[in-house]
Amino acid sequence: MISFLARIKFAPGDSAEIDESLRILATASRQEPGCVSYIPHRVEDDPDTVLFYEQYQDEKALEAHHNSKHFKEFFTSALQQKIQEPKIEKLVALI
């Protein structure tokens, strides 16, 4: 199992556009073979920051996600220009 926590800070004031893009991305990502969990969260006291909790069965599933049409479209869209501080952390389960 591969797990990630991705924190992405966007430029202020684009929450409606971001929410719609994330809805499309999450819906498509959850349908991928090998995607166990894909949940975007808005940080309560920082509305311009989104956290993604992602889990994949294996490296093959993660690679398929990174090569998917919806992933590429999200990261080549106009929103890409609004990302200010991306941080990706790979997680290791304790139990």
Where are these predicted regions, by residue range?
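An amphipathic, aromatic/His-enriched active-site/gating alpha helix that lines ligand/cofactor pockets
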Residues: 24, 28-36, 55-88
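Glycine-rich beta-strand-turn "strand-cap" elements at beta-sheet edges
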Residues: 2, 40-48, 76-95
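Short, well-ordered beta-strand segments in beta-rich or mixed alpha/beta enzyme
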Residues: 2-8, 39-66
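Short flexible/disordered coil segments
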Residues: 7-8, 69, 94-95
